[in-house]
Amino acid sequence: MRAVISALLITVVIASAATVTAPASAAPQAAAPQACPAYLDHEFRKLHSSQTINICKAFAGKPLLIVNTASHCGFTPQFKGLEATYQKYKGRGLVVVGFASDDFNQEAKDEAEAADTCFLNYGVTFTMLSPQHVKGPEANPVFQELNRQTAAPGWNFNKYLVRADGKVLQHLDSKVAPESSEFTTAVESLLK
């Protein structure tokens, strides 16, 4: 008797599952993910690491704050404010990406030293990339496009606010500190 009841229960469960499951063609279509702009679809090596990151794959559809950085610059203390910005807004989707660069001859010649400046001295937890060019004909593909849409960095710690669709919203120069109301207003505008 128990065997018959068990068999009937199994049959009912299977039949119920078959009627509840809709055919794949009837399933609602999810919205297509936003296409990532080609200029962000590149592999970059992380600072003082062998690991690489593709900005599109890692951060597609998220607003970005992209900054060219250097570890021996008068603006280097901005790392602290950039980290505070990242901590404050990451819950709202903001991603901060620092591109170390020696284009203005102020980056440490040793990547370990540059990493210590960022990670140990300033407690940076946002993505930092290995030194590369951010201006001129040798600029990496990200900065080629940022420079095209706005302006090339005139110094270290230029900040580029990039919408989730890849369009550059605003370029802020080195003198605009992460703690300033101008900067905060720009970030808030990006996240609307």
Predicted regions and their residues:
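Positively charged n-region of N-terminal signal peptides that target proteins for export
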Residues: 1-4
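Bacterial N-terminal signal peptides
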Residues: 7-17
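Loop/turn elements at helix/coil->beta-strand transitions in domains of secreted/extracellular proteins
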Residues: 60-64, 90-95, 122-127, 156-157, ...
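Amphipathic alpha-helical repeat scaffolds
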Residues: 68-72
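Structural microenvironment flanking redox-active thiols in thiol-disulfide oxidoreductases
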Residues: 75-139
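Thiol-/selenol-based redox modules, centered on thioredoxin-like
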Residues: 141-144, 148-192
